Amino acid sequence: MKEKNIYLVGNPNCGKTTLFNQLTGLNQKTGNFSGVTVEKKEGVVYLPNLELKITDLPGTYGLGGIAEDKKIAYEVLLKRKENEVVIYVLDALNLERGLQFLLQIIDMGVPTLVVLTMKDVLEKKRIQLDLKKLKHSLGLEIVLVNAKSGEGISELKTLLSKEESYRKQKRLWTWGSKEESFLTSLKQKLKITTNEAEFFLSQALKFLNHDPHLQDSRYLNQFPNETKQFLTKELESKPLQFAYQEEMIHRSILIKKIISETIHYPIAIQGSWEERLDRIFLHPILGFVCFFLLMGLLFQSLFSFAEIPMDLIEEGITGLQETIGNVLSDGPLKSLLIEGILGGVGSVVVFVPQIALLFLFIGILEESGYLARASFLMDRLMGKFGLSGKSFIPLLSSAACAVPAILGTRTIENKSDRFTTIMVSPLIMCSARYPVYILIVGTVFSYPPIFGIFNVQGFVLFSMFFLGMIVSFTFALIFRKTVFKENASYFVMELPRYNLPSFKSLFFTVYGKVKSFLATAGQIILYISVILWFLSHFPAEYKDNVWKTSPIETSYIGRVGKVMEPAIEPLGFDWKIGISILTSFAAREVMVSTLAVLYGSEEEGEESESLRETLRADKKPDGSPVWTPLTGLSLLLFFAFASQCMSTLAVTKKETGSLLWPTVQFLYMTTLAIFTSFLVFQLGKILGFV
């Protein structure tokens, strides 16, 4: 079977990801681009006698740029192999913006097939597009699709299998008359005949002209020293405008001509209902009300809608534990499988429905176009804290995970903005905290719904999200006033159209993220659960063909816990909670599996029950409950602020290029966590809430 590598390229919000999901389905994997940690999505399309490997490049408005993720597309296309081609995704409603990028790719001499999206919107708005004339103007093969419904995808797959579908085209636009004449004579003298060689020549000329947008000498270095000297001498004697801005102007002239000949807009693109929605969502007061209502709805749904699948998973794990218990004879293997592996890993798997709902909700906000509006709205608020709206997307991304959120700060050109965002991103409630929060909230805040509608647990979870935002903004202001004093950058963005999210695209997005969560967290949880099981059961002795394990208080882990208990008792924590805090430094969700293993070891031989029920039943020596609302609140606040994630600290070091900033991050967050938990628990005791 033949193989072909294809790069999927386009502007942000052009339908590129939806098209990628339509083509590849579940045949996807994620990784990183070589040399950087920007996420790379790859997928496979199987056609008769042909396997297409598609790489989804980061969405960008052009080639090159200051931010590192913007350079990725440029570097990949520049270093592509001869047989690698491009599918360029062009938004039919934003031709002017999309054609600027496409013309740059044509200049590079890359074989390209154009996919024109938004077919449904064209028809709905009665926009007339002359596809035949557009093909003729560009000299490329173009296929019109509806990426959401899949209309036109079969025609696209037919074209993908044909080599002639990917076409090279000579530069379509022209420089000014002096520059064009000079370039023509140079090409003749240097015997340049290919697109690629002409592209390198024009880049070298821009470099020699000291273009601020091009400070890379590698294009000039492609030529022999004699040629370099010749080019330098020629440019010194002639005042020519070889510059990026000039390119943009001359491309725009051609683009306006193409658009005027190929597309006709009988009605305004922006519909009145969209304008009315923007008046609400972007309103300085109503906009924030809508944002917090949406967040409140999310956290209510995490408990209301996920309860049934959570119970089913919990029952399934319990049933599996009981089956293994009936099949295997008593001994270390049985205990390891039931309490260590199933008890540890299963305790986190139970929370997958709620994590999936979180990813689904964020996906809906992003695909609908609301997330960009939330960024625009937050720019006003964040400006008061020394940040711009550019920081909002990475901060909101922290609701999934702080690691990609910190990597996402590469889109922020202002160094002070970027470093501040990196330092405060871990304060936003992430998906790793969800299993911890949900366990604590479900254990100590199991009250009837307010007014019979509003779930108390959902309200507490929303409060934790809101608290994380407020504290992150507060520390952003502190950092901007003390350490990163450079002026904040301006925030300019294009608001995408409102779209009805694609169910298929949402499914693939949620599936991929849940799979990634289980793959990364599950491996860590499995290893730590096995180690904890060993430490909580040993020392043990084998006597009369029977294994006799130590009581958990006298086991290795129990001894460590008892030593640290006096230090954490003022925070309201016992030794088991202390051990779970220690292990959760590897990954926050490990706290849940740690408690499951510790409590499972303590109650060996008893009937299996849910971890929440076990925690509620736990008593101190004086008969009072270990898990009270005050203890739960103290623990929630500790996990809200503590730097309990090695991966976050590692990526902070990588992105800042210094050990100083992850050290500062760890110290300020851990100090804040200990101080807040201590203050709340001690005040609660004084007020009689123990």
From Swiss-Prot:
Q: Which family does it belong to?
A: Belongs to the TRAFAC class TrmE-Era-EngA-EngB-Septin-like GTPase superfamily. FeoB GTPase (TC 9.A.8) family.
Q: What is this protein called?
A: Fe(2+) transporter FeoB
| CDD domains tied to this protein | FeoB
Chain residues that bind GTP: 10-17, 35-40, 56-59
Which residues belong to the signal peptide in this entry? none
Q: What's the chief localization of this chain? A: membrane
Q: Which organism is it from?
A: Leptospira biflexa serovar Patoc (strain Patoc 1 / ATCC 23582 / Paris)
**Function recorded in the entry:** Probable transporter of a GTP-driven Fe(2+) uptake system.
Keyword Repeat in annotation: no
